[in-house]
Amino acid sequence: MDSSTVGAPGSSLHGVTGREPAFAFSTEVGGEDAAAASKFDLPVDSEHKAKTIRLLSFANPHMRTFHLSWISFFSCFVSTFAAAPLVPIIRDNLNLTKADIGNAGVASVSGSIFSRLAMGAICDMLGPRYGCAFLIMLAAPTVFCMSLIDSAAGYIAVRFLIGFSLATFVSCQYWMSTMFNSKIIGLVNGLAAGWGNMGGGATQLIMPLVYDVIRKCGATPFTAWRLAYFVPGTLHVVMGVLVLTLGQDLPDGNLRSLQKKGDVNRDSFSRVLWYAVTNYRTWIFVLLYGYSMGVELTTDNVIAEYFYDRFDLDLRVAGIIAASFGMANIVARPTGGLLSDLGARYFGMRARLWNIWILQTAGGAFCLLLGRASTLPTSVVCMVLFSFCAQAACGAIFGVIPFVSRRSLGIISGMTGAGGNFGAGLTQLLFFTSSRYSTGTGLEYMGIMIMACTLPVVLVHFPQWGSMFLPPNAGAEEEHYYGSEWSEQEKSKGLHGASLKFAENSRSERGRRNVINAAAAAATPPNNSPEHA
């Protein structure tokens, strides 16, 4: 058996024996793979995932998928939070109480708890293109229906239904994980999700601007806010059509076509679900994301009204300040992903985990300070720092998610995303729905919960890479970790081939420092003397 064969003696030492470049093994292609790789505009690895990202390119399939993914997610964020900057007008029109506004905020993020769970399964079984396109277009009628409501119950119900569209986050992250190499996945996931989340800030600017334009055309305030909803509704329709016609599930084609050709195996949903829910790391990341992305969604719902009421600001000024919270995503979330990738390059997976803890704990501290701030400048500074750290933590979390499981990636992404929405709904219900707490006090308590709920990250341990405080298990290898998700019968049929390829490409998570140390240890001769000396 040749030592280059996966599973052969010495195969786990590739990159540390001195015979192979330590970081080349995960991305080199040759022979038939090299011929197949030549059809792509970007350099690719053995799975045909892009090894670089070129933001100004629309090359098919990698960069076209990237842009379709983040723009579709962006449009869903715009529509879901379009009501937030217009609440002072809507509440007067519909006679909404504080409880009604709080319940609507909970509803807007609760709907996607279910849709994100479903989207994870859809991505695994049908592919992200169908999931993304159909959800966006199915949500479009509910966005248009916002212009027809005339009661608090209708307002809450429609915001609940629009919130289902936030499940495009799952298809976005899944899509990026199938298109880009593991060495840059933190940055790519951060860019796609961060630019999509930016819609929560952009809508704070877009909707008041559209409202003002319609008002200047002669419409009454109570008519203008309704007509403004035609902008996000139209955006849904356009993006749904573009994703369906221009998108592609995998680097080599669409999932259904590849399955018919026999290039991709059809998986069992029950087994995919089983390996997702029985992996304890999944549940820790559900909690972590609940108090990173979750608090971001909660803040999107309350921040404009908070500044409007507490500091007696003009609606437009409050909207601009609130917009800066969501707009920070353009740099914050990608920065979190980039820090995750850079740390992993030298220290491996352990650096990714430390990155999550540092960023999310800092975000909780700044959230607490935001609630205690008594002046406008101090509040704005604390809000910006809280925003940056919380959103960077989101990027850092999805720098790790692709490594939790290869087989159940879609469902784990969906569960983690749903955790974000569950955390948002729970936090809004606890601190921002009743009159028991002021919004400032609610922000203080939310900051404390963020810091407390970040602590379980210390329990995340990968046998082959270790955890925050513990080294990797002796003899643990990537092939065994990802291969353990397949039964011996499935392995005999070769169904685990994609997992083995991913395992090979994920060896970079050992970190350059660990690889150097392993190579040094392998090169050191035994420190003993012959018995006859």
Curated annotation (Swiss-Prot):
Factors inducing expression: Circadian-regulation with a peak in the middle of the morning. Induced by nitrate and sucrose in roots. Down-regulated by ammonium, glutamine, asparagine and aspartate in roots.
Localization in the cell: Cell membrane
InterPro entries with a match to the protein in the record: MFS, MFS_trans_sf, NO3_transporter
Gene Ontology biological process terms, A to Z: cellular response to nitrate; nitrate assimilation; nitrate transmembrane transport
GO molecular function: nitrate transmembrane transporter activity
Entries under Pfam families matching the protein: MFS_1
Alphabetical keyword list: Cell membrane, Membrane, Nitrate assimilation, Transmembrane, Transmembrane helix
Bilayer-spanning residue ranges: 70-90, 101-122, 133-153, 160-180, 190-210, 227-247, 283-303, 319-339, 351-371, 384-404, 411-431, 442-462
CDD domains: MFS_NRT2_like
Domain of life: Eukaryota
Tissue: Expressed in primary and lateral roots, root-shoot junction zone, vascular tissues of adventitious root primordia, leaves and at the base of the embryo in germinating seeds.
Membrane topology field: Multi-pass membrane protein
Cellular component annotations (GO), alphabetically ordered: plasma membrane
Note: Plants over-expressing NRT2.1 have accelerated growth under low nitrate conditions.
UniProt function note: Involved in nitrate transport, but does not seem to be able to mediate transport by its own. Acts as a dual component transporter with NAR2.1. Imports nitrate with high affinity when expressed with NAR2.1 in a heterologous system (Xenopus oocytes).
Family to which the UniProt record says this protein belongs: Belongs to the major facilitator superfamily. Nitrate/nitrite porter (TC 2.A.1.8) family.
Oligomer and partners: Heterotetramer composed of two NRT2.1 and two NAR2.1. Interacts with NAR2.1.
Protein name: High-affinity nitrate transporter 2.1
Organism lineage: Eukaryota, Viridiplantae, Streptophyta, Embryophyta, Tracheophyta
